[in-house]
């Protein structure tokens, strides 16, 4: 029921629904050998991970040329938003950055099986040349001050960052503002009343 409810809420095509279901099956299969998601969250994967990732697309003001997902790990949100973009903006490209080789292998397998317009970089974020991304996402990767430092070199001039954050977001924002100037919107999360999505732009070090 959870799967049907989430797919109905997302209001996506049959092909996108099938790809999301295929991806969830891949995560569940690989999770037995590679720690992709917490075992306690497997039963709630459709809300805790799929919907939580998919909601990021609702905060776009235009379709991105390049979406950069940092610390992609299990493919949430990177793979999910790439699946949804296949219908909505097939011209968009996705770059998923993951330094863990086993997780990068999983991501490549998922991209290949799902025929996604996505590249996987098995590298540390700090080692990458500037990507000039229109959208940068990162989920459960680092505290906001560190995320700003990781994202800033790769953000296009009019690009945005979308960072899902939990209950501690207020203190993270205060810490980030000590070192970074930014325009910020704090948006409600569809999956957790205590969580938010931070939408940042015009990132500049103080």
Curated annotation (Swiss-Prot):
The keyword Metal-binding does not apply. Its EC number is 2.1.1.170. GO terms for molecular function: rRNA (guanine-N7-)-methyltransferase activity. Keywords: Cytoplasm, Methyltransferase, rRNA processing, S-adenosyl-L-methionine, Transferase. GO terms for cellular component: cytosol. InterPro entries: rRNA_ssu_MeTfrase_G, SAM-dependent_MTases_sf. Its main location: cytoplasm. It catalyses: guanosine(527) in 16S rRNA + S-adenosyl-L-methionine = N(7)-methylguanosine(527) in 16S rRNA + S-adenosyl-L-homocysteine. S-adenosyl-L-methionine binds at residues 71, 76, 125-126, 139. SUPFAM superfamilies: S-adenosyl-L-methionine-dependent methyltransferases. It is found in: Cytoplasm. Belongs to the methyltransferase superfamily. RNA methyltransferase RsmG family. Specifically methylates the N7 position of guanine in position 527 of 16S rRNA. This is Ribosomal RNA small subunit methyltransferase G.
């Amino acid at each position: 029921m959870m799967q049907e409810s989430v797919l109905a809420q997302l209001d996506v095509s049959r092909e996108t629904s099938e790809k999301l279901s295929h991806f969830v099956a891949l995560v569940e299969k690989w999770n037995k050998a590679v720690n992709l998601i917490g075992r306690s969250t497997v039963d709630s994967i459709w809300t805790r991970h799929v919907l939580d990732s998919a909601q990021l697309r609702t905060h776009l003001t235009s379709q991105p040329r390049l979406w950069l997902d940092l610390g992609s790990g299990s493919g949430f949100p990177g793979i999910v938003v790439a699946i949804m973009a296949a219908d909505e903006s097939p011209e968009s490209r996705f770059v998923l950055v993951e330094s863990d080789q086993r997780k990068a292998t999983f991501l490549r397998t998922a991209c290949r099986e799902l025929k996604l317009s996505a590249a996987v970089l098995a590298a540390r974020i700090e080692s990458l040349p500037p990507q000039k991304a229109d959208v940068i996402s990162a989920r459960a990767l680092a505290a906001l001050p560190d995320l700003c430092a990781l994202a800033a070199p790769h953000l296009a001039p009019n690009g945005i960052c979308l960072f899902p954050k939990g209950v501690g977001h207020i203190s993270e924002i205060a810490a980030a503002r000590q070192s970074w100037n930014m325009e910020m919107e704090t948006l409600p999360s569809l999956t957790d009343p205590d969580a938010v999505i931070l939408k940042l732009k015009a990132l500049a070090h103080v």
